[in-house]
Amino acid sequence: MKTKAPMKNIRNFSIIAHIDHGKSTLADCLISECNAISNREMKSQVMDTMDIEKERGITIKAQSVRLNYTFKGEDYVLNLIDTPGHVDFSYEVSRSLCSCEGALLVVDATQGVEAQTIANTYIALDNHLEILPVINKIDLPNANVLEVKQDIEDTIGIDCSNTNEVSAKARLGIKDLLEKIITTIPAPSGDFNAPLKALIYDSWFDNYLGALALVRIMDGSINTEQEILVMGTGKKHGVLGLYYPNPLKKIPTKSLECGEIGIVSLGLKSVTDIAVGDTLTDAKNPTSKPIEGFMPAKPFVFAGLYPIETDRFEDLREALLKLQLNDCALNFEPESSVALGFGFRVGFLGLLHMEVIKERLEREFGLNLIATAPTVVYEVHLTDNSIKYVQNPSELPPENCIACIKEPFVRATIITPSEFLGNLMQLLNNKRGIQEKMEYLNQSRVMLTYSLPSNEIVMDFYDKLKSCTKGYASFDYEPIENREANLVKLDVRVAGDVVDALSIIIDKNKAYEKGRALVETMKELIPRQLFEVAIQASVGNKIIARETIKSVGKNVTAKCYGGDITRKRKLLEKQKEGKKRMKAIGKVELPQEAFLAILKID
């Protein structure tokens, strides 16, 4: 395999696309056309390495591959960085785009521009990337290339006169696209003679080599005999190995030079030692300052994860630690619940990230888990002028100690067919949304910009959005600020005891409605006991809704045939006393469905 090329013959590019617009299939075509993987080893979605990615048809972990291509008698190196398309994984997108000079903007010829595409394109434009529009799926009978071109120009403001029209599935236009990448996307810039400056834009854990860093060399070069300084930690490490990325196998090399992308092995045991966005430099001749403008991924949603078999707490800890080796955005800390025992409070990027992590824990580690209702971080101002950050409803201080509560807001961008506009605006109003902007992209599509409380979108917003627009709307958001809100803690009491795992922080105006729905749902789910069970929803000490599960009746008078009525009365009174005693000491086992029900109640 050819390995080295002058910097003028290197092209670093990424692929920006909304979920399901054919990005992974296009990546497969480019890999196949450049013969980076033999036909025998080639399979669909070769860049997607997790089973969950293939099953759901999504990209979660950004991958990279080095391609060699000959154009007009010259050898070129094309470094392709595949990126996720879902809003939860936008941190993967931003780090990948920082290491490129260009990006392919892939748009489905049947669907047009979607909200996530716009968000990622703006990240690329902020990083001064050359954008190359690519219209995919042109072979489909309902493809409308002219309308999509106009859509891209109107929505993003990119000239589409030289747009590439391709079909990744039918392999149409792939050769022309490769040539356009070479002629349009600029070569990397950098000083070969300057001290080493390398940006870590991804890291993961390898069972044999330890923590590996995927880097873009901005200045200078790195070789296997160098000692490296990780600028964020101030620690020095020897280089154990350098590799070029390939989805199936790493290709060893003795050096990585300015403009190149490669994998660095420093023999480290955790990805926390090589944080994404950190800078590698030469320990003996370091660069003056690290690469700027990189933010670590912050969790957006928090939920409790508890093992159903309580003796598997340590297994859950081990499993989370193993997943954290590959996922710097995942963080967790132990917590305990009266109802569920010992578990962990886990921070996620969003609901899809939470679903994927829970599914991987259950599938790869054989755990059975209960997840509590997802929540966000609230800023609680106390009467003594101190501030407390609360991510678990059970940690909320008593009402008389709180001066005010601020909740995080997001700016949401939603693109929808205009026929669903009324339904969508009603949903956004129900979710306490504030309209900022409404813009018609063309006669049939509208772009809405709303500010929304984060709390309202972490429950079931995405499902309801798809439901009220028949799946046609696309959605993207970015965090903006914390705003004061009228929030209260809604508790659920079963047989007089507060079930801490079911507590939620909610807008005061919605508390009664939610509490009513919650107790009615739980009445259906909790099995009848030998004693009467009261299910109550409360705010502070005030009960706002109640349902009662009647006791299972045993006919104690069945053996009394006729005779004195006092005999029957005596047996019934004895039963009544027994039930009263049982009610005082009896415990109610809550089924798992009760914890899942809270997620589905609007």
Curated annotation (Swiss-Prot):
GTP binds at D20, H21, G22, K23, S24, T25, N136, K137, I138, D139. One of its GO terms (biological process) is positive regulation of translation. It catalyses: GTP + H2O = GDP + phosphate + H(+). Residues 8-189 form the tr-type G domain. The keyword Acyltransferase does not apply. Keywords: Cell inner membrane, Cell membrane, GTP-binding, Hydrolase, Membrane, Nucleotide-binding, Protein biosynthesis. GO terms for molecular function: GTP binding; GTPase activity; ribosome binding; translation elongation factor activity. SUPFAM superfamilies: EF-G C-terminal domain-like (SSF54980), P-loop containing nucleoside triphosphate hydrolases (SSF52540), Translation proteins (SSF50447). It is a peripheral membrane protein. It is found in: Cell inner membrane. PANTHER family: TRANSLATION FACTOR GUF1 HOMOLOG, CHLOROPLASTIC, TRANSLATION FACTOR GUF1-RELATED. This is Elongation factor 4. It comes from Helicobacter pylori (strain ATCC 700392 / 26695).
